[in-house]
Amino acid sequence: MEKNAKIYVAGHHGLVGSAIWKNLQDKGYTNLIGRTHQELDLLDGVAVRRFFDEEQPEYVFLAAAFVGGIMANSIYRADFIYKNLQIQQNVIGESFRHNVRKLLFLGSTCIYPRDAEQPMKEEVLLTSPLEYTNEPYAIAKIAGLKMCESFNLQYGTN
């Protein structure tokens, strides 16, 4: 990436997104774009489309997600799968529509089987059951991963 490339970090105030943001700044990238949830609701497809139309990012880091702890995962199962699928569909779809040079989609350790050996290896993905309490979130993340893979295979995106 060029140091002045337009880079959008979705979720730049979260745990992972803020680390990505800081790392990019430390490496001298000068054209970083970030929006808080109040400034841009990633669940709103029209707002996401408008943002991409206006900002025209060249690179996208998708670190935004609807997250919670064990209790929230148990109570709000529908919200976890629905909201994460919606965020991913909006950001990945607009990244494709705007021909971004590269999209980095972040998964989660919870996409791996519940009983995966440590350290986890990519080959064990989808080989056995997920942890039940994380299942809706994990399935949404797996769907995002497969969505990116499918765009790459069908359209040659990166």
Regions found by a protein language model. Give the residues of each.
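Adenosine-cofactor binding site in Rossmann-like domains, unifying the SAM/SAH pocket
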Residues: 25-50
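Active-site Tyr-X1-5-Lys
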Residues: 132-158
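Conserved Rossmann-fold NAD(P)-dependent oxidoreductase catalytic core, especially the SDR/UDP-sugar
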Residues: 3, 89-134
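Short alpha-helix in the Rossmann-fold core of NAD(P)-dependent oxidoreductases
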Residues: 80-88, 99, 104, 140-141
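Conserved mid-core alpha-helix of short-chain dehydrogenase/reductase
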Residues: 47, 86, 90-94, 147
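NAD(P)H-binding glycine-rich loop region in Rossmannoid oxidoreductase-like domains
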Residues: 45-85, 97
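N-terminal Rossmann NAD(P)H-binding glycine-rich loop of SDR-like oxidoreductase domains
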Residues: 4-27
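SDR active-site strand-loop-helix element
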Residues: 10, 35, 60-66, 103-109
